[in-house]
């Protein structure tokens, strides 16, 4: 794990946030409390600022970056699926879900409880309205919206990652060290 300053900018990491040993967090990065940063994730605050709210999960091999002098902003309880790339987004609002392998590009705006499907590409400046689902390349917003049942299910899934952030510091024991 690399948690490092870059040109005088040091990551700020909230209480109870877990960063996997193979993840990298450096530069102007703020992580809220209770976040889970998975294996291979790269959160790069070398060009611009990265701000994640509380209880976010950044799954395996994600990349989060910002343009020089700009900020990538991510709300609370956001799930970023395995292998997703988040680049210089204007805002990913609370409870949003970014599917595995999705790309969310510059100045995109993802609404509260919005879902970006697996492998989707959200283009520069594109807006995904709250509680809507976007899929495809390029991402298209579906008429179908997120149901209360779906929200309840994802609330449980999101809590699983908050629980992992508490369990990993003691539970993760590399072979030969336990």
Residue ranges and their predicted role:
Residues 1-37:
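N-terminal segments that cap or nucleate solenoid repeat domains
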Residues 1-12, 46-54, 60-62, 67, ...:
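Glycine-rich hexapeptide-repeat left-handed beta-helix
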Residues 31-55:
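Generic amphipathic, hydrophobic interface segment in small proteins and small subunits
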């Amino acid at each position: 794990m690399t948690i490092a300053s870059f040109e005088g900018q040091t990551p700020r990491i909230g209480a109870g946030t877990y960063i996997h040993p193979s993840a990298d967090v450096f530069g102007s990065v703020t992580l809220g409390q209770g976040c889970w940063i998975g294996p291979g994730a790269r959160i790069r605050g070398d060009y611009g600022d990265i701000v994640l709210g509380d209880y976010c999960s950044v799954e395996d091999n994600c990349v989060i970056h910002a343009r020089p002098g700009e900020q990538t902003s991510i709300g609370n309880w956001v799930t970023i699926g395995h292998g997703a790339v988040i680049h210089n987004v204007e805002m990913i609002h609370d409870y949003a879900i970014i599917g595995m392998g999705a790309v969310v590009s510059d100045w995109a705006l993802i609404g509260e409880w919005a879902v970006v499907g697996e492998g989707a590409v959200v283009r520069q400046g594109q807006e995904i309205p709250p509680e809507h689902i976007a899929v495809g390349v390029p991402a298209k917003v579906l008429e179908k919206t997120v149901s209360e049942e779906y929200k309840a299910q994802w609330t449980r899934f999101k809590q699983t990652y908050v629980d992992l952030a508490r369990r990993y510091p003691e539970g993760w024991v590399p072979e030969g060290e336990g």
